[in-house]
Amino acid sequence: MEVEYGTLQDIGSWMELVRQVRWNFPGLETQAALEDHRRTVLRFMGEQRALCVKDGDKVIGVLLLSKKHNMICCLAVDPAHRRNGIASALLEKALLELDRSKNITVTTFRENDEKGVAPRGLYKRFGFTEGKLLVEFGYPVQEFVLRGKVQ
């Protein structure tokens, strides 16, 4: 499985995946929000901050990262391809792109939210620990933190 940078040629398939899983991402409920997200993905692609895994030409896993904020912004895998190591491969590549000497953050669902079981387990396996309780797009979430390594 190869993790690669998303390109303009991937945007259609990328957004198809986003539409398929948008119920898992607060803030993507409307067409306007999806269009705004598409613009964001294109910007991230142009800055090599958009990672993906493909099956042929079909995007089946995506990850957006912010080097400025040292964070994982979005991670999603096609439901038909879950439990095949795609999320782990994307996260491994992202951690190579981010500054490991500083804290790396990501927000995900809270502990008692059934949508949070898989992502929380993934982040914990990579060494992230539970952080602050937050609200994003009106939805309760929790920050996870991977502590920076002292050099």
Describe each PLM feature range.
Residues 1-9, 148-151:
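Conserved N-terminal entry element of GNAT/NAT acetyltransferase domains
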Residues 8-74, 78-80, 91-92, 97:
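Acetyl-CoA-dependent GNAT
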Residues 54-56, 146-149:
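Active-site beta-strand termini and strand-to-loop segments that position acidic
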Residues 75-86, 109-112:
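A short, internal acetyl-CoA/4′-phosphopantetheine-binding micro-motif in the GNAT/acyltransferase core
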Residues 88, 111-132:
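Conserved active-site alpha-helix within GNAT-family acetyltransferase domains
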Residues 98-112:
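Conserved GNAT acetyl-CoA-binding A-motif
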Residues 137-141:
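Short acidic/glycine-enriched loop/turn segments that link adjacent beta-strands
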